[in-house]
C-alpha cells in the first residue's frame, strides 16, 4: 500500500513519485508514499508530528532556537517552527547553499556552526546520534550548549534515547524525542494507508512506549 521514508532519503525520493501532496510540495520533503493502483503519491506527516509536539509541550515561540540540519527533516521542523510563531532562530548547517536557502525561506539566520549562538531551544535534525551511523555516540550539541538551553528536541528515533536526549535528561531539561515524532506521524501514515484512524487509547499506548 505504501512505504515510509527516513533520513537521508526524504528529498532524494521525490523524482521517483508521481504526485506530491500539498504538505510534501510546500516543504519539499517526503516521509510517506502511498501506492494507489500503481500511482505513487507522496506526503509529509513529520510536519504534523512536530507541530503537535511543540504545542503539547507548550514550547514558547518566544524562545530562540538553533536547528541543526538543512535536509528533509529539517525542512519539516523549520516549517512547523514558523507556523508556531517562532521568530528568532538559527539554521545550523555545514552546507551553505541548502542552509541559507532554508533560513531565508522562513526568515531565520544561517550559521555554519553554533559558535556565538545562545539558544533556549536546541533541535537536532541530522543523523548525529542515530544508531548504526558514524556519529552514533556523538552529541549533536556540546554539553555547554545543552546546559544553557531549556528545551532539547532530537528527531532521531533510533535509539529511543540518543546521546543528546540522555545528557539533557541528566541535566533536567525538557526533552522531546524522535520516538515521539515517529509515533505521531505513524498514526497519520496509518490513516493514509488504510483510511482508518486508530482510537485515542491505542495511540496513547504507542506514545507511552515511544517515551521509554
Positions of the model-derived regions?
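Phosphate/diphosphate ligand-binding glycine-rich loop within oxidoreductases
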Residues: 1-57
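Short glycine-rich anion-binding loops that position phosphate/pyrophosphate groups of nucleotides
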Residues: 5-12, 72-73, 127-130, 158
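Glycine-rich adenosine-cofactor-binding loop
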Residues: 44, 61-82, 86, 93
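Short helix-loop-beta connector
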Residues: 58-64, 147-148
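Conserved S-adenosyl-L-methionine
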Residues: 83-88, 170-174
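NAD(P)-binding Rossmann-fold cofactor-contacting core
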Residues: 84-106
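Rossmann-like adenosine-cofactor binding region
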Residues: 106-175
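Adenosine-phosphate binding glycine-rich loop
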Residues: 155-212
Amino acid at each position: 500500500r505504501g512505504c515510509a521514508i527516513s533520513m537521508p532519503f526524504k528529498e532524494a525520493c521525490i523524482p521517483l513519485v508521481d504526485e506530491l501532496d500539498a504538505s510534501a510540495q510546500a516543504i519539499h520533503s517526503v516521509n510517506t508514499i502511498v501506492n494507489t493502483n500503481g500511482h505513487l503519491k507522496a506526503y509529509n506527516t513529520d510536519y504534523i508530528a512536530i507541530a503537535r509536539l511543540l504545542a503539547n509541550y507548550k514550547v514558547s515561540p518566544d524562545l530562540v532556537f538553533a536547528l541543526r540540519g538543512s535536509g528533509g527533516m529539517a525542512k519539516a521542523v523549520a516549517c512547523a517552527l514558523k507556523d508556531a510563531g517562532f521568530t528568532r532562530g538559527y539554521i545550523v548547517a555545514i552546507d551553505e547553499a541548502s542552509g541559507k536557502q532554508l533560513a531565508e525561506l522562513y526568515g531565520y539566520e544561517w550559521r555554519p556552526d553554533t559558535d556565538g549562538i545562545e539558544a533556549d531551544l536546541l533541535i537536532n535534525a541530522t543523523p548525529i546520534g542515530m544508531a548504526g551511523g558514524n556519529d552514533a555516540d556523538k552529541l549533536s550539541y556540546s554539553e555547554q550548549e545543552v546546559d544553557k538551553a531549556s528545551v532539547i528536541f532530537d528527531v532521531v528515533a533510533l535509539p529511543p534515547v540518543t546521546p543528546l536526549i540522555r545528557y539533557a535528561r541528566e541535566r533536567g531539561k525538557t526533552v522531546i524525542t524522535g520516538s515521539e515524532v515517529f509515533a505521531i506521524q505513524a498514526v497519520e501514515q496509518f490513516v493514509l494507508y488504510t483510511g482508518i484512524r486508530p482510537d485515542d487509547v491505542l495511540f496513547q499506548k504507542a506514545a507511552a512506549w515511544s517515551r521509554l
